[in-house]
Swiss-Prot record:
CDD domains: Urease_beta. The gene is ureB. It is found in: Cytoplasm. This is Urease subunit beta. It comes from the Bacteria.
């Protein structure tokens, strides 16, 4: 093996096995492209995106780490979300959630999304 080389296991690598998943339809109602990264709390994604945010609380994209999904203006696509793992804590992002994702934390996040107007049609 050469210094700096990457040695990858043979076979198929399964990610997020055993975690709750959800398919959600997303439309970009904005005028600019929106890109969402693999570990971003999806309920807090850009306000120009229209989707069922209450079901996305505590979820992120079910894609490999370090990758992202791009939504072009006017585009509608279906993505798969996966439950946030580990300690299930969401910090920062757009300030809608800063909590552990238990039922109480999900209620707090939903309340913040409603106050910000993000539960209505997408922000244009």
């Amino acid at each position: 093996m050469k210094p700096g080389a990457i040695q990858v296991a043979k076979g198929i690598i399964t990610i997020n096995e055993g975690r709750k998943t959800l398919e959600v339809s997303v439309t970009n109602n904005g005028t600019r492209s929106v890109q969402v990264g693999s570990h971003f709390h999806f309920a807090e994604a850009n306000g120009a995106l229209s989707f069922n945010r209450d079901k996305a609380i505590g979820m992120r994209l079910d894609i490999p780490s370090g990758t992202s999904v791009r939504f072009e203006p006017g585009e509608e696509k279906t993505v798969t979300l996966v439950e946030i793992g580990g300690r299930k804590t969401v910090r920062g992002l757009n300030g809608m959630a800063d909590t552990y994702m238990d039922e109480r934390g999900k209620e707090k996040t939903l309340s913040n999304l409603k106050k910000a107007g993000w539960m209505e049609e997408a922000i244009r």
